[in-house]
Amino acid sequence: MTARVLVVDGNNAAIRARQAAATGYDSGVGYVNALRRLDPSLHCDVVRPADAAVQFPAGVGLADYDGVTITGSALNIYNGGAEITRQVDLARAVFDAGVPFFGSCWGLPVAVTAAGGEVRANPRGREFGFGRRITLTEAGRAHRLFAGKPAVFEAPTIHLDYIARLPEGAVELATNDMGLQAAAFSHARGTFWGVQYHPEYEYLDIAAAAERYGVRLVTEGMFADEAALAAFARDLRQLQARPDDAPLLWRHGLGTAMRDPTLRLAEIRNWLDAVVLPHARRRG
């Protein structure tokens, strides 16, 4: 049976329009592209609760899905508002339905909040471009989410959120100098695996985000000036076209976890193989 996955696009319409103008697709479509790269047979639906109440396809409900995943977002949990509370409410419904649940970046704070944890702005500031020296904990090295992943790696990263308190019973799976980078926990009838970075991102996505954030990244001290920011984005666009460009890979300190798409996408692949596809087989 074909597995059915619900992709929850965390961005609002204005942000998605800017993404699409820069890359040709928005965060929801980009996530579907990553999922289908791993398994072309997947049936994927996209909902966008930042805009309005969720409308599933006719005759379909949460119980009809074998997995739910939340994309990244330029929103921040602690700012509140309807475009955020609708997503947290949807996460609670996913937990109640017992559907396998995954989140990239924004998806982790949403699920943590839904399950009773706490999210704040990171006192260390924004993490942008590539999360460095992400290190698996002992639990992470043993967890199916990270099967085949190096014990220390870098990953596409864009976030200001910080997990100040995990839900009861949660397990830390990976950390770096900026804080928690991955966790797993159960809540209500469901189980969540999540990462604070973007395994689904291409180099193009990071370049487009750098251009979208613009001078804010200079003000925050991520880049010396706008010329340095533009050079960074230009390098990543070149890597998108030439992913084996050794001088650029060296310049940005990118190891095998970024050079090899199989490793970059390992967390999503492992979630599909370990949880989603078995759920689809049981559902019949």
Language model segments and positions:
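N-terminal beta1-alpha1 cap of cysteine-dependent amidohydrolase-like domains
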Residues: M1-D89, A93-V99, E220, A224-G284
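Pocket-forming structural segment of enzyme catalytic cores
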Residues: G10, G117-A209
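Short glycine-/acidic-enriched loop or helix-start segments at secondary-structure transitions
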Residues: A17-R18, F56, N79-G80, V112-A114, ...
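Glycine-rich, phosphate-binding/catalytic loops in enzymes
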Residues: T23-Y25, I84-V88, V119-R120, A174, ...
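Active-site phosphate/pyrophosphate- and oxyanion-stabilizing loops and adjacent acidic/basic residues
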Residues: V29-N33, P109, L160
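Cysteine-nucleophile active-site neighborhood
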Residues: S73-A139
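Active-site-adjacent pocket-lining segments in enzyme domains
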Residues: T113-A115, L136, G140, A147-I158, ...
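A glycine-centered loop/beta-turn motif at secondary-structure junctions
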Residues: L180-A241, G253
